[in-house]
């Protein structure tokens, strides 16, 4: 029993390394197979290292010739599968049973096998394989089927044949000296005579491959001829197209489309540039037209100024003739002669223009000039005037009252009216100038003399007006350039002052409408009594703050000027007032003030429209 157990144990121990060896071999072969599949370049490089079968046949043929020349020498053993490592390893390891059969072959058998192989190759013409074409070692085309027994090849299973297809990893297997190359081995084995025969064999092989090369050359020549014919046809078409079109190239459709698109883009760019030039010219012409319109307007303004001068001159003549306040009899006789002598064409033309501007019939205008009377009969004597002989002698300082002239010329009836009644006639009933001044906290019109100039600084700058005398020469008059800026500045300052007063009055009226509690408090305090100074101060501060907020929106410069005016606004009863029963402004008075302001605005609008109409005429 013990011997049997030891026998089984030894067998098991011997099987274990055998199993490991088998599994390692299979794993190595599998890994090598996968490596060659993943990297076919490596496989091609290894396959290219084998000699081609034609070279092997040539070497066998040379060996046969050498045997015929030297029969005493033994033929060397050339294995056609010299580069394959797997069969040779198996021959060395375990296939010793086939060696006696191989050794039993004689030289005659070898020669017979080689001759049959060469005859078969000559009978079956094959295309010359490429130099770098990999050769399958077990292919049936290279070797006949009946030669398998002669070459003593072992019948491998299919699994092992797959491994046989792949080349060995190293060429040095089965060589006597692995450090020598193939050409060195051949040089050692062959003599100069064998090399000469080898050259003859290669010449014969070149003759066999000659027809194929000739076929290739013929194909190349035919292809060249075909391409030459195509070039000739293309040139002929080009020549014909150039004759028809007129020298243009026969371009393809894409090139034509590209050229058309480029031309269209160029045309569009040229059109845009032309349009821009036209627009620039139009703008320039428009600017010139605007300048011409400005010149026309200036000429119209000058004409209207001249007309206004003529009208003022005639009106002064009428007033002077009507009043009868001429200085001496010579002036009276001169005025009567002026109206008695016949009118020339220029004066008639001037009268027609005056009647057209004033919208008065010419007959009425002539009657007015002759009689010097007004239709309403309210002729007031003006200040004494010296009648100038020429229109150019009128000083423009006398024409600095455009509002006076407008009020005279543009009344409701179409005839002149005085300046003093212009403001009082427009006031509604029950509302006087004193009420408005009390509302604004100013003095009455009787106690306050309105100064024409806003400040004494401008009054000092005004040049004195020189009286006109008939004997005074033109050299004594001041030039226009010296005193015109002062007159214009004075007029602008006066207009700005009037505008500011009007804006202040309108704003105070709006404040009274917005804060009706001020009026109610005034009505309650009509009974004479002494109000608390703290309440008065609070109300005054509220009103002053509201006025400052309003003025900050417009301009910060007017805030300091208008703050004392707001302080003078009567909120409560005055502290030191001699008239305790002072009348306060009520709602009716406020509505009257608003009506008056609206009426003034409407009159100003009508005057502006009439003035524009006169200028356009």
From Swiss-Prot:
InterPro entries: Chromogranin_CS, Granin, ScgII
Propeptide: 28-30
Stretch forming the signal peptide: 1-27
Residues modified as Phosphoserine: 174, 268, 432, 532, 555-556
Cellular compartment(s): Secreted
Keyword Secreted: yes
Modified residues (Sulfotyrosine): 151
GO BP field: angiogenesis; eosinophil chemotaxis
Keywords: Calcium, Cleavage on pair of basic residues, Phosphoprotein, Secreted, Signal, Sulfation
Predominant location category: secreted
Spans annotated as Disordered: 123-147, 552-583
Cellular compartments per GO CC: extracellular space; secretory granule
GO molecular function term, any single one: chemoattractant activity
Domain of life of the native organism: Eukaryota
Family in the record: Belongs to the chromogranin/secretogranin protein family.
PANTHER family in UniProt: SECRETOGRANIN II, SECRETOGRANIN-2
Note: Binds calcium with a low-affinity.
Subunit comment: Interacts with Secretogranin III/SCG3.
Function: Neuroendocrine protein of the granin family that regulates the biogenesis of secretory granules.
Protein name from the UniProt record: Secretogranin-2
Origin species: Macaca fascicularis
GN (gene name): SCG2
